[in-house]
Amino acid sequence: DFTKRMGVIRFRKRDDRESDGQVKGGWGPPVALLYRSGPSSAMHIGKSVEQLADWLVSFDPSYLLAYPSIMNPLMDAVAARGGRPPSLEEVRLISEPVDPELQSRLATEWQVRCTDLYSANEVGYIAFRCREQGALHVQSESLLVEVLDDAGQPCAPGATGRVVVTSLHNLATPLLRYEIGDYAEVGAPCACG
């Protein structure tokens, strides 16, 4: 629901950090091009856990976008302030692997959905976790993802290789077969289709 509050904890450019914690009138581009959205607020990941917890409790978003590595300390700090953000419905985790224990903790202690998004600064969202099977689905509408072995050949299902991406929508600086430094295991086709 784009009309609800969105909170973001992630790396922010130095110029953007001056607005840490300020409430803005929408979620920003590209959402603003398609939908009218509710208020948003962002904090730089470099803030102290105490500052992030105070902001989260005060802003009380419905959705939180953050890195997995900050969530356990953040949950501990919020618990020390009396529990959980009451309006929070979903935590969207980006850029790092998500530990199953963290997913379980979010579901148990905060009673929220946890969405795992595989992403990279260079290309944005790469894949979303399937709610039916748990595998990651590549966002093939916006990029081509290859998992290549040491010889530069596509890996077979079950094999691990280097992640190479080609952005299909970046008109300013096209990334062609860009190796992002990650490794992934190729899965079998998902039963969801």
Task: Put a short name on every predicted segment.
Residues 34-193:
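Active-site glycine/GP-rich loop and adjacent strand/helix microenvironment
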Residues 1-33, 39-43:
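Conserved AMP-binding loop of ANL adenylate-forming enzymes
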